[in-house]
Amino acid sequence: MISFIVTTYNLADWLLRRCLTSIVAQGLARDEYEIIVVDDESTVSPRHVVDEFATQVNITLHIQRHKRQGAARNLALCHAQGDWVQFVDGDDYLFEGTISPLLHIAEKNNLDLLMFGFREVHDDSVKRIRIENNWSFNISTGDDYMLHHNLLGSCCMLMFKRILLDDSQYDAPLRFTEGIYIEDEEFATKLVWRAQRMAKIDTVVYAYYQRAGSTVHSRSHEHTDELFRNYIVVLERLLHFESSLGDNTHDGFTRKVRTLAVDVLRRSLREPNWKERWMDSVHQLRSLGVYPLPAVHYSMKYSVFRFLTMCAMGRRILHWIEKSQNRL
């Protein structure tokens, strides 16, 4: 069985209805899945939307006092009964008929975790995509994957075994850090590192809906300040975890942490007050020991970026590049 965990906060009815409809349309038998909806104390409860699906599927609704998405997901994990877990944000959806083939691949190959593709969408239609029967993939450890690929900091593109969260070989269960943005970055990095058998399939499964006013697109000064503070919090927590790994293989984990520092710098370069934001970010990253960026050839892009950060003219070039790309 797979547990679909859906988080909501002040969503329009049609968005949540579209999300839940896409889960029901996966072609799974009723006893093969459950839907756990957690609402973060919306102004208007989504119960009437959830009740529309009560006769079709095993679905439950939980209400929490406004604690943000990390706490909502943790609450859902406490109630999850499935062998597998799939997160879906309430304003996103899954392309029809994609999850069942993924489950077959994951179980046939004894995977701990399966990563898949996504597509940005900007309308209200559930599009269909062609599902290939013979998907190609390579199996590796999570750490080896992160050593050779950039890991997207979103847990919604990861279908994983629930037992991976509470594996007895680790000191504590894996849960989301609560009360912050970008909680996905920490959770996804630790989760993928735990996977001994994982695969990445490029097939598009997840529809990532772009809407004005979402937390990832908010541009208020207060939100931007908090976002940068949260990046530092996540980096601190990942570095602390890294220091506890000892002899465990974690070269890929280290690469992910270093590239997350690059993300902070790139975001700094996109800001209107980019020079001040850059200096503040450098100060914070230096105090954590992740700046200057290490001279490691993770990729050509990383090496070029690192080289350009070392002089004022290089930073101006990077600012121009990031500003140009951000307009697209």
Protein language model regions, located:
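Cell-envelope/extracellular polymer assembly enzymes that use nucleotide-activated donors
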Residues: M1-S3, S22, E34, E186
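Short, well-formed alpha-helical segments that are part of the catalytic scaffolds
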Residues: L11-Q26
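A conserved acidic beta->alpha catalytic loop
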Residues: D39-H48
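A short, glycine-/small-residue-rich helix N-cap motif at loop->alpha-helix starts
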Residues: Q64-R73, L77, I180-Y181
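Donor-binding/catalytic cores of nucleotide-activated saccharide
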Residues: Q69, G90-A199, Y208-D225
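Short aromatic/hydrophobic "clamp" motif used to bind/position activated sugar donors
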Residues: V85
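Catalytic core of nucleotide-sugar-dependent glycosyltransferases
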Residues: V205-A212, S218-D247, N273-V290
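Membrane-interface aromatic/basic loop that binds lipid-linked glycans or pyrophosphate carriers
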Residues: L269-L328
